Amino acid sequence: MGAAEVGVLKVIEEVGLPIDYIAGTSIGSIIGGLYSVGYRSAQLDTLFRTQEWLSLLTDREDSLKNSIFEEKDGTYYVFGFPISSSKKKTNEPGKFGALKGDRITDYLHRWLVNSPSGYFRSSSTGASGSALHVSDSTDFSRLPIPFRCVAFDAKKMKEVVFTHGSISTCMRASMAIPGAFKPVRMGEQMLYDGGCINNLPVDVVRAMGADIVIAIDLNQTQHENRDISLEEMFGITGILDWLVSRPDWKRYNANREAADLLINPPLEGYDVLSFSKAKVAEMLKIGESTGRKFRSQLLEIKKRVME
């Protein structure tokens, strides 16, 4: 569904509206993080169209996709999808998730290192006489566009807003869907998809200093305000139910209202498993066509910004 966000960004760029701050959750953290280091809609469009997203997000072993059941290097696969491993790693979390997410982490690292801005460089020195590596602890406020991403600490049941750290790891934590991906551990924190707690972080980007906020909301269902007790949230079933039903509708609805412009592409019939190239192309087109419907509002915001 994130491809639709790229389509909207294309229109924002076309009208020449500058972006000074970015905050994202889940797939929005990946798009936002890449955008913050120099990727633009054209490169993101290509990336969405050319990646094998099913393999990328599921750690699928493509060489085994035609095998019903296969073992390779200590891991068992069904049609190429990893289902269990005989290898035990003491530093690997073992709760609420089937997929480690190693492949997406590796690709995020690669995309960041090769960012158009050249912000991250693997060499020992750069043009300025200093260099950063993508795995270093990075101050997100010093990126070409200041950036924040949101994750959910399942131990404390609270929001975590990343302001610094390994950007690829933080992006990976923000998209760790409960029940699908292993959580990311940082110290005592067990981190999952930020959509569990704040799926439209308008308040986060406001706190960064943004005066005018454009929110791209991929959610397709509007709900009444609903609070969920801690008892409901304990365990994997509770977390999954919490993710599906949205944790704090008062906050979500408040963030919708707080946005200066809310763009909500119509994505009924699409979901997080819409990985095919045809579906991706359709969502890119939907995002762009939706963005064009808001062209006059975007131009008005540009006028306000430039005054």
PLM features: residue spans?
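Patatin-like phospholipase
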Residues: 1-25, 33-307
